[in-house]
Amino acid sequence: MAKSRKSNRDKSKDSNWQERVIQIRRVSKVVKGGKKLSFRAIVVVGNEKGQVGVGVGKAGDVIGAVRKGVADGKKQLIDVSLTKSSSITHVAKGVSGGAKVIVRPAAPGTGVIAGGAVRTVLELAGLKNILAKQLGSNNPLNNARAVINALEGLRTFSEVAQERGVPLEHLYT
C-alpha cells in the first residue's frame, strides 16, 4: 500500500553526474563447451565539481557492462581540490601498472591539454586549465587509474600549512 519514494530521490540525486565510456572490449573465457563471450566497459563518472571515479564493468551485453561500470565508478569516487581558475595547486605524478601520468597546473585560458583517457578523467573532474602527459603504457584503464592516483596526491595550501603546524599566512614567509 505504501508507495516507495526512493525512485524520485535517486533521480534528483543522480542528475548532476556525467558518465563517459572510455573503452568497450569484447572478451572471452574458454570453458568446456567452447568460448563464452562477454563485454568489458571502462567508464569515467564525474560531476565536474571536483569528484571523479573510474569504474570497470563486465557483462554479457554492452548495456549491462556500462551500467556495472557506472556503479563501480560511483563507488570509487575521489575529491579533487580545484583552484579558482579550475586548475590544480601543484605538479603531481601518478603511476598504475606500466602507465605514468604527469599533471601540471596551467594559466587561465589554456584549456585541457591531454590525450585519451587522461583527458576524459580531467574534464569530468571539473578541471578547465591543466596540462597532462602520458608516459609508458597506452592502456586506457591504467592511464585513467594513473591520473586518479595523481589527483589523489594533490594537497591544498591549507593542508600543507596544517601539516607543518603554521598559520596559512606564514606558510611561504
Swiss-Prot record:
Keywords: Ribonucleoprotein, Ribosomal protein, RNA-binding, rRNA-binding. The keyword Amino-acid biosynthesis does not apply. This is Small ribosomal subunit protein uS5. Signal peptide: none annotated. The N-terminal domain interacts with the head of the 30S subunit; the C-terminal domain interacts with the body and contacts protein S4. The interaction surface between S4 and S5 is involved in control of translational fidelity. One of its GO terms (cellular component) is small ribosomal subunit. With S4 and S12 plays an important role in translational accuracy. Located at the back of the 30S subunit body where it stabilizes the conformation of the head with respect to the body.
